[in-house]
């Protein structure tokens, strides 16, 4: 079906944080791709530190004034909603054709702005849905979905969840990876990072996301401990962990497991916790790792999987959606994420030279298929449904962007 050309749009993209999290990285890359397609996309995020986004953006980006907040997760989310409402309290601040929420926080702010008639409505991307026992958080999660004018998901899995649990239809837009930044080509910075982390000659395994239950870090630690019996020089790098939520209880369990297994933590030790990693160092971190171990229990898509594959690093993932949507057998090692023995066996298998070569080649092909400009083009029909009709018309997308716009699955 031929779609009408989309006019030049001013798009406000709102995410929950300036920290290096998958949803934030997605928002920035989407904004950059939309600008390359001729639109004006401005990415917003609450910024209590005043330091700006975790990386320099190649599109307009606004750090929304926000104050540090202590206490419960509900108190934090409520404060961040209020920060957004204060920022968009004037017609001048609301001078956009399309408002696009990437999270529950911004979805609730835009829902309130819609009810106040400061904006005509908004698009919401649901990356995943966090289960919560807090009634207020659950209410906010539901409102940010049901009050949206249009819904998007990265995967068919989450689109199906929205249909089943909320009776809501979502279009599937996928995601992308920056193939100019994430490449398999080594550089001198790789060895410098290796030295700074104290990595030796043994195999290096990488876990991304910090100590967080959703990332299944405890199972990774236990699997790594089992693997070290055959590879005593192996090291595990646990990167990231910048989260708005409190994971102290789960972190304590991870630390107890490390102590129980006799795994020392620190530079040059069996386990290295980096905390948030500078964006400039991430490609090197993927390249110096032998394997990305990512048996996550719940993901919207798994951006770090694509980044690792683009860098030529073999990947271990959970044998469940959304990974099964875009990874065929032989493109990654798939495991039952609740079976630490299976994770350890996959870590061992990932070191076999022949298998490594096949995984590297297949992974790079997967990454090449995830193009940000094509992902951005898949957003445009949804934007056009909510945008005013008097914007100047841009030429229709051509090439890969047009192909993907027409062929992305539209119903889930």
Residue ranges and their predicted role:
Residues 4-7, 14-21, 28-82:
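N-terminal strand-loop element at the rim of the active site
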Residues 12, 199-215, 221-224, 237:
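Conserved donor-binding/catalytic core segment of Leloir-type glycosyltransferases
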Residues 101-106, 126:
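Short His-centered aromatic/hydrophobic patch
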Residues 145, 284-289:
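Short alpha-helical donor nucleotide-sugar binding micro-motif in glycosyltransferases
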Residues 251-280:
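Nucleotide-activated donor-binding/catalytic signature segment of Leloir-type glycosyltransferases, i.e.
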Residues 297:
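Aromatic "clamp/platform" in nucleotide-sugar-dependent glycosyltransferases that forms part
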Residues 305, 314-317:
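Short hydrophobic beta-strand element within catalytic cores of glycosyltransferases
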Residues 329-341, 349-354:
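Conserved acidic donor-binding segment of nucleotide-sugar-dependent glycosyltransferases
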């Amino acid at each position: 079906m031929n779609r009408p050309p989309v006019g030049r749009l001013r798009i406000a993209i709102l995410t929950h944080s300036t920290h290096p999290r998958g949803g934030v990285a997605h928002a920035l890359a989407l904004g950059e791709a939309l600008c390359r397609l001729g639109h004006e996309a401005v990415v917003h995020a609450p910024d209590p530190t005043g330091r700006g986004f975790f990386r320099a953006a190649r599109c307009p980006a606004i750090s929304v004034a926000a104050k540090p907040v202590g206490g419960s997760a509900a108190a934090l989310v409520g404060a961040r909603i209020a920060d957004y409402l204060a920022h968009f309290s004037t017609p001048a601040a609301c001078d956009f054709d399309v408002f696009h929420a990437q999270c529950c926080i911004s979805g609730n702010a835009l829902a309130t702005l819609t009810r106040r008639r400061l904006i005509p409505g908004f698009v919401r991307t649901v990356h995943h849905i966090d289960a919560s026992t807090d009634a207020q958080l659950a209410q906010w999660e539901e409102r940010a979905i049901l009050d949206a004018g249009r819904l998007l998901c990265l995967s068919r899995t989450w689109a199906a969840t929205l249909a089943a649990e909320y009776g809501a239809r979502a279009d599937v837009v996928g995601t992308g990876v920056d193939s100019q930044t994430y490449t398999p080509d080594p550089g001198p910075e790789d060895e410098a990072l290796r030295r700074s982390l104290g990595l030796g000659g043994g195999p290096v395994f990488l876990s991304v996301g910090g100590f967080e239950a959703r990332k299944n870090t405890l199972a990774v630690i236990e699997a790594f401990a089992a693997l070290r019996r055959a590879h005593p020089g192996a090291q595990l790098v646990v990167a990231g962990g910048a989260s708005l939520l409190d994971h102290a209880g789960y972190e304590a369990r991870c630390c107890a497991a490390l102590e129980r297994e006799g795994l020392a933590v620190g530079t040059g030790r069996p386990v290295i916790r980096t905390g948030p990693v500078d964006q400039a160092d991430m490609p090197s971190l993927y390249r110096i790792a032998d394997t990305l171990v990512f048996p996550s229990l719940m993901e919207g898509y798994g951006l770090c999987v694509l980044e690792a594959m683009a860098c030529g690093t073999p990947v271990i993932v959970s044998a469940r959606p959304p990974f099964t949507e875009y990874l065929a057998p032989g493109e990654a090692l798939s495991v039952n994420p609740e079976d630490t023995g299976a994770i350890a066996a996959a870590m061992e298998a990932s070191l076999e030279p022949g298998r490594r070569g096949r995984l590297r080649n297949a992974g790079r092909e997967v990454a090449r298929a995830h193009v940000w400009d094509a992902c951005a083009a898949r957003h445009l029909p949804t934007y056009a449904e909510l945008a005013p009709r008097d914007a100047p018309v841009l030429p229709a997308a051509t090439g890969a962007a047009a192909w993907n716009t027409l062929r992305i699955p539209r119903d889930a």
